[in-house]
Amino acid sequence: MARSICFFAVAILALMLFAAYDAEAATCKAECPTWDSVCINKKPCVACCKKAKFSDGHCSKILRRCLCTKECVFEKTEATQTETFTKDVNTLAEALLEADMMV
């Protein structure tokens, strides 16, 4: 009896963790549209991003671009699965390249 209660508690906890993980919003990145120089300092980059209606910003580590961030709201669009997969692969490739260069 004690084992089944323990198992049930662990199962409920695991379900709650998975539900919370899936509910977390993704972070979208885009270059600041008005930035035209090399990004060295984060403070002006954040100001540029806030002006462009983003929530935050930072300088990219490799190319020194001003990247703005905000929470993504994905809606069902008419994009095909191939287009979505291609965008995900490109984003992942950029992240891996940036991570490899910093190691």
UniProtKB/Swiss-Prot annotation:
Keywords: Antimicrobial, Disulfide bond, Fungicide, Knottin, Plant defense, Secreted, Signal, Vacuole. CDD domains: Knot1 (cd00107). When compared to other plant defensins, the petunia defensins have an additional fifth disulfide bond. Residues 1-25 form the signal peptide. Pfam families: Gamma-thionin. GO terms for cellular component: extracellular region; vacuole. This is Floral defensin-like protein 1. It comes from Petunia hybrida (Petunia). The gene is D1.
